[in-house]
Amino acid sequence: ASSTWGGSYPACENNCRKQYDDCIKCQGKWAGKRGKCAAHCAVQTTSCNDKCKKH
């Protein structure tokens, strides 16, 4: 992923990384509801990848 986002799209990469970090925090906070976090993360990752490709 970093090869796609690296250099050319630093702002996009940083935003995606923050979203991913938030997702990891969610999994830690809601360990018993991991499915909810996984779905949330998948949406963020997909939208982020689309944005990076378009820009």
Curated annotation (Swiss-Prot):
UniProt GO cellular component terms: extracellular region
Subcellular location per the Swiss-Prot or TrEMBL entry: Secreted
GO molecular function terms attached to this record: sodium channel inhibitor activity; toxin activity
Superkingdom of source: Eukaryota
Disulphide bonds in the chain: 12-48, 16-52, 23-41, 26-37
Hydroxyproline modifications at: 10
Protein keywords: Disulfide bond, Hydroxylation, Ion channel impairing toxin, Neurotoxin, Secreted, Toxin, Voltage-gated sodium channel impairing toxin
TM region positions: none
Function: This toxin increases the excitability of nerves by delaying the inactivation of the voltage-gated sodium channel (Nav). Only acts on some crustacean. Neurotoxin B-II is less abundant, but 15-fold more toxic than neurotoxin B-VI.
Family listed: Belongs to the worm B-toxin family.
Protein name: Neurotoxin B-II
Species for this entry: Cerebratulus lacteus
